[in-house]
A protein has these predicted regions:
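Core catalytic alpha/beta fold that binds nucleotide/phospho-ligands
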Residues: 1-191
Length: 191
């Protein structure tokens, strides 16, 4: 789904807290509002009634009484991860990544890894894999993406706390703390 109607958003608004309604309506476009609401409803489905959240100094929302959670959405789907320890998730569609975007968001090693793939689709897949890993890491750390260019994604997942998965036309990555396992609950849904 790449669009949502005002009617769909209006149907979802009564199903979430006043705080989440306010957050959703801050999105300029209807589709952003829709994704914000649907992702919160998916979180509610996983953990039950969701209390109002607070924000850390970098703007990351958290539940004062736990659990830790992370939400991501793109035009193709929504992903939610929860755990007893800090966790980050990102989901992205596999799509064309232009050279300018690659240069702005990837370090030299990552750029080389992307460009050395056997085909353009494999390069796009590798870009999505690295992008979601970076995004998941900054979400797990709760620091936001202001440090994106400096972040060194560890390519060898056997030595890192990052798991990356591909499902149909999108890739999602989960970054989790040293003390937690990958037993976190993860739910994805297509829009």
């Amino acid at each position: 789904m790449e669009e949502a109607t005002d009617e769909e958003v209006q149907c979802l608004l009564p199903l979430v807290s006043a705080q989440r309604r306010e957050q959703a309506l801050r999105y300029k476009h209807t589709f952003g509002q829709f994704c914000c609401l649907k992702s919160w409803l998916l979180l509610q489905q996983l953990i039950g009634e969701v209390e109002d959240f607070e924000y850390n100094e970098h703007g990351k929302p958290f539940l004062p009484n736990g659990p830790f959670f992370s939400i991501s959405h793109c035009k193709e789907g929504i992903a939610v991860a929860i755990d007893d320890h800090p966790i980050g998730i990102d989901i992205e569609a596999i799509r064309h990544a232009d050279d300018d975007l690659i240069a702005r968001t990837m370090n030299e090693l990552e750029q080389s890894k992307i460009k050395n793939q056997k085909s353009k689709i494999e390069s796009d897949r590798e870009f999505a894999r690295l992008w979601t890993q970076k995004e998941a890491i900054v979400k797990a750390q709760g620091v936001g993406i202001q440090s994106f260019e400096q972040l060194q994604t560890i390519i060898d997942n056997r030595k890192s706390n990052i798991e990356t998965f591909e499902k149909e036309k999108y890739i999602y990555s989960i970054a989790y703390g040293k003390l937690c396992s990958i037993s976190a609950k993860v739910q994805t849904t297509e829009l």
